[in-house]
Structures are given as structure tokens and as C-alpha cells.
Amino acid sequence: MWNRTEDQIEIHLTLIRHWATLSNKEGRYLGKTDETLSPDGISALEKSVADRIYPTADVLFSGPMKRCLETAQILYPGQTPIIIPEWTEMDFGAFEGHNYQELSKDPNYQRWIDSGGILPFPEGESREEFIRRSVAGYEKMVYHMKMIWERSAASGQGDRKIQSVSAVVHGGTIMALLSHFLGGEYFDYQAKCGQGYSGRLAFKAGKGAPQWKEFRPLSEVTVSEVTVSELTKGETNG
């Protein structure tokens, strides 16, 4: 996958939270329920496409749920996403489908709040389990990228130059991946629907896992059509 003049390949990675569903609008815990985007969510998404606020993608990944796939289809028409099965949202268990007002008198919910979100969701998933699952999905994404490079090299076309990768996922997936790879608190990386984070992955020949570099909120990246060169100047739920 490496040509003779390169000992490092860097790609731009954008993690995008899907646009809004009705449950998102109502503040409900939306995990394993496979809900579609709401009409308002679709309208906002289509406007974002018209405004060209998202980067282009040489390769597109997505979680398997409808809200991610619909977002990916509208953001990147004509591109078929590679689906990562591990990138479903966290299983909220007994809290699924409920909002704060409905749960406010539930002692199990109060215990979960008091724990700072550390306790496992009753009848659901723990944060540690969810992070492990999300990271396993990321490793699968990296595997797919390496296979693309290797297939292009084997075909005699040389390395395929992947410069920009987008992944449409859930808010929880973004928090899981960034807290794992960048450090900090899990909830430091919350993203609203349609928002996310952008940065670079640096792959070094023979150096194992890629390094995460310079990730920042997508809202801080002012672009009409993002290119890697523009973004690398000046190195420095549901």
C-alpha cells in the first residue's frame, strides 16, 4: 500500500452525526430504534447540501441504521457507503424512547444521572462496552481503507490516493471514538445533529495503528468544498 517515496500517508477524516429524527427533536433517548429522519431533519439536511458546508469524500462510511444511511445518501448522492455494522448507537435499554420529563421520577434514571453517565443503562449497554464496539468498527474502517489501497496497487494502477474520508454515524459513536483516541471526557465531544469533528489520520509504514491529529468541531471548519491542503495549513445522542 506504500509507494517508494512515501513513509507516511495522511487522510482527512470527517465524522458527521446524522441529521434529526422526530425522537431527536423531542429529546428522547434514541438508540436501537431504527427511526428515519424527520421531514424537518431532511429539509435542514438538504439546505446544508445546498450551502456546501460538508467536505467531499473519496470514500464514504456509514453506520447501518436508517438515520445514518439517509443522511449519507443526501449528503453524498451517487456514492455508496461502506457500512460498518458495529456503528449502531448505544443501547439505552429501559430508557429507550423516553425523554427527561418522562424519566425524572425514575430512581434508576436518577442513579444513572448521579453517576455522571458512568453506570450501565438498565437492560442496556455500558459505556465501556459501547466504546469497545465503536473502536472495533473504526478498526474495520481502517481495514477497508487498506484493502482499497492494496487492491489498486495489485491492479497495476499504483496506490489509490484517498485524501478525504467521511463517516456518517451517531452522536454516541463520535464521543466514543474521540474520547478513546484523543483523551478527555466522553461528553466533551458532544455533537448536535448534522455536526461532527474533522481531523487527520496519519498512517506510517510499519508503525501500526494510525495517529489521530488536529481534530476540531466541524462548525469551526469554514469551507465551501473542503480539500486536504486547505485543512492542513498551519499545523498546529442518537
Model-derived regions, located:
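Active-site signature of alpha/beta-hydrolase-fold catalytic machinery across serine-
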Residues: 74, 176-180
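Active-site-proximal alpha-helix that buttresses catalytic centers in soluble enzyme cores
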Residues: 2-4, 11-79
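Domain-level recognition of soluble alpha/beta enzyme cores
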Residues: 182-213
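Short glycine-rich phosphate-binding loop at a beta-alpha junction
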Residues: 57-64, 149, 159-168
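Short, well-ordered beta-to-alpha junction loops that form the rim of enzyme active sites
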Residues: 19, 63-65, 86, 165-172
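Phosphate-handling substructures
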Residues: 75-136
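Alpha-helix capping/helix-boundary segments
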Residues: 66-68, 137, 173-174
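Conserved histidine-centered catalytic loops in small-molecule metabolism enzymes
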Residues: 6, 53-86, 111, 202-238
